[in-house]
Regions:
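Short beta-strand segments at enzyme active-site cores
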Residues: 38-39, 109-112, 220
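Glycine-rich anion-binding loops and their surrounding alpha/beta cores
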Residues: 2, 7-10, 16-17, 62-70, ...
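Short glycine-rich or small-residue beta-strand-to-loop segments that form or flank ligand, phosphate
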Residues: 12, 43-47, 80-85, 301
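N-terminal glycine-rich anion-binding loops that anchor highly charged ligand groups
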Residues: 2, 11-57, 64-73, 293
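Acidic, glycine-rich active-site loops and adjacent beta-strand->loop/helix elements
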Residues: 83-88, 113-119, 158, 224-225, ...
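Active-site cofactor/substrate anionic-group-binding motifs, chiefly glycine-
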Residues: 50-113
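A glycine-rich phosphate/pyrophosphate-binding beta-strand-loop-alpha-helix module
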Residues: 43, 92-148
């Protein structure tokens, strides 16, 4: 196995690591015996060189192996819906809302997330503001999924090995590979994924990496005006991923029968502001751009799951989940569950 100095030298020479070397790199980064200065140098050198798909694949495989068990049955056909963040959009937590609406449509959702890192309000912050308790352990998370069709896996509970990296990332103060690893390392390893990426190049990188992971299907999306979500603002790129294969295409909100909106229409605030906005959509009270945005995301999730054959069919099904009260009832059921 390569030593930390050998890995650092290779990165400084701008030579890519093999997947096996990337796994060795993660082992060094998560080893408490690795000096913080060396861990910081390795992270900075990798970021400066630029991460490539074989490296990201090796890192993701290593992190998945280190993750704590979730207690969720293997092989469950569920989806994770997440954005990388980092797009500076200040939106109202689109991925969290999309995840709840998708679950209300009957597709099991295992959302993996954290507190705010690159936005004013992360997915854990958002759920708590909605009155939803974060499952305290794997047993509670699995029980929540079985009872409601939705659960949240709080990343620090399942990836303790990376705890020592957090202060190093904070000191560096720049984007590192961990900003894009999170969406790839859901500890339950659901076979379906809807991932938003903050740049087109990162979307392609994540798609190429997912093609080497044990998945069934995933969409990696980069939105109009640099958003890390599909939105009604404008056309968005979709990388359609299956094992060993990536197909790219451009889609428009009009394909889904959704009218365009401005970025200002999707503006968010703090956790309480965002919770009020999302609750209004799920209760059927807001029929504007916020609703359209969640309908669009849910339609994509339903397509990934093979539940629909036409874009507008997905929108109709998501609309019905709101108008029938199913989305509101899901939120109420989640609020009633203990941590």
């Amino acid at each position: 196995m390569s030593t930390p100095r050998e890995l650092l030298q290779q990165l400084l020479e701008r030579r890519d690591l093999s997947p096996e070397q990337a796994q060795a790199l993660l082992a060094q980064l998560t080893d408490p015996q690795t000096p913080p200065a060396m861990a910081g140098a390795l992270l900075a050198a990798l970021s400066t060189k630029g991460v490539v798909a074989p490296e990201l694949l090796g890192l993701a495989l290593a992190m998945r192996r280190l993750a704590r068990p979730t207690g969720i049955p293997a092989g469950l056909r569920a989806i994770d819906i997440v954005g990388t963040g980092g797009d500076a959009s200040g939106s109202f937590n689109i991925s969290t809302g999309t995840a709840l609406l998708t679950a209300a449509c009957g597709v099991p959702v295992i959302k993996h997330g954290n507190r705010s890192v690159s936005s004013r309000c992360g997915s854990a912050d958002m759920l708590e503001a909605l009155g939803v308790a974060i499952p305290a352990n794997a047993e509670a998370a699995a029980a929540c999924l079985a009872a409601t069709g939705f659960t949240f896996l709080y990343a620090p509970h399942y990836h303790p090995a990376t705890a020592g990296v957090a202060p190093i990332r904070a000191v560096l103060g720049v984007r590192t590979v961990f900003n894009i690893l999170g969406p790839l390392v859901n500890p339950a390893q659901p076979p379906l994924h809807l991932i938003g990426a903050f740049s087109l190049s990162v979307a392609r990188l994540m798609a190429d990496t997912l093609a080497g992971l044990p998945i069934e299907r995933a969409f990696v999306v980069h939105g109009a005006e640099g958003w890390d979500e599909p939105t009604p603002i404008g056309p968005f790129t979709v990388f359609d991923v299956r094992p060993g294969r990536v197909d790219a295409g451009l889609r428009s909100p009009s394909d889904y029968g959704i009218k365009s909106c401005s970025a200002a229409d999707l503006a968010g605030g703090d956790a309480q502001d965002n919770a009020r906005a999302l609750q209004a959509v799920l209760a059927g009270e807001d029929r504007g751009a916020h609703r359209d945005c969640l309908l669009l995301g849910a339609a994509l999730a339903l397509e990934i799951a093979g539940e629909t054959r036409h874009p507008q069919e997905g929108v109709a099904r998501a609309s019905a989940a709101i108008d029938s009260g199913a989305a509101r009832r899901l939120l109420e059921a989640l609020r009633e569950r203990p941590a």
